[in-house]
Amino acid sequence: MVKAVAVLRGDSKVSGTVTFEQADENSNTTVSWNITGNDPNAERGFHIHQFGDNTNGCTSAGPHFNPFGKTHGAPEDEVRHVGDLGNFKTDAEGNSKGSKTDKLIKLIGAESVLGRTLVVHAGTDDLGRGDSEESKKTGNAGARPACGVIGIAA
């Protein structure tokens, strides 16, 4: 079992943790989150980005992690970036707790997400279904109020 965690911080009140667990290289990965400080009753995009570099804030993380050269999509789509996690929903206080299982995100192997950045976005991810070219790259999810590098957890 490999476990990892990203501690989310940024230039906003958004903060939290996202944890990852993968039993072995052939297993799906469980992604769990506890994120606070978002807008109430909203859907916010979150993605794994290419780089674990936050020297200039969350913008240094680069584009979505996309080792297979696909277009942006929903987590359940066959064609999507490895880093496409979709949206999480917030409650009346702007908080969100949840988990999902993902078949593309890996902690073990050549396409591991360890050392990359988990970014929470300021807008809703359109899951690549928008009319613009940007939809196929980013899901039009907007600014990056919080992020954290994915590191090995105890």
UniProtKB/Swiss-Prot annotation:
Highest taxon in the source lineage: Eukaryota
EC numbers: 1.15.1.1
Localization, UniProt: Cytoplasm
Pfam families: Sod_Cu
Keywords: Antioxidant, Copper, Cytoplasm, Disulfide bond, Metal-binding, Oxidoreductase, Zinc
Amino acids binding Cu cation: H47, H49, H64, H121
Residues the entry annotates as binding Zn(2+): H64, H72, H81, D84
UniProt family annotation: Belongs to the Cu-Zn superoxide dismutase family.
Protein name as annotated: Superoxide dismutase [Cu-Zn]
Organism for this UniProt entry: Emericella nidulans (strain FGSC A4 / ATCC 38163 / CBS 112.46 / NRRL 194 / M139) (Aspergillus nidulans)
